[in-house]
Amino acid sequence: NTNAAAARVLDRLGISVSPAREAGCCGATEYHLNAQDAGLARARRNIDAWWPAIEAGAEAIVLTASGCGAFVKEYGDLLRSDPAYAEKARRVSALARDLAEVIAAEPLDALADATPRRVAVHCPCTLQHAQRLGGAVDSILTRLGFDLTNVADGHLCCGSAGTYSLTQPELATRLRDNKLDALEAARPDLIVTANVGCQTHLNGAGRTPVRHWIELVDNRLVN
């Protein structure tokens, strides 16, 4: 479980986590499928779910899926004309952080290990393009001693692309196969990514296992 792994790693780094039990889907899928009202309704519900923690002094809203993080960072803009939510949405977007942003800012000695693993990183479009955090996961894993492979055309999409894999399945499959060929070229032990959509789409090919990068870090702590 990605969120559970993230909570354990953050705890090891001395960062307390307050789960927002009422928070749910960020709304991106519906919004991008032309159901904007439904997507924004989800955004409002999430704002309501997070607001008590924000009022209590929460320093960040941490997202483990880069697609969700990119969308939550847009809440302020998307709800700017809603008098009841505009200011709250702006505050939420300002506090939103991808997990890699939080981990990268911490000393990582507590997570270090002498056992290297050969890993290929797929950086999601929503991390490297939408959030402009390309290389963030690579940097963390390198600091932790993982052996990262060189991946050709790392800027290209894996084919998941939010709802694209649903609306254009044939092209999405070709993009996926091309991406996996690039990721597998240097024979990694496994592939990691930072977005559940990419992870699910790539794993659908049944080739090299694809996991969220924080699960790899968490597994090191457990073992």
What is each of the regions a protein language model found here?
Residues 1-223:
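Iron-sulfur cluster-binding electron-transfer modules in prokaryotic oxidoreductases
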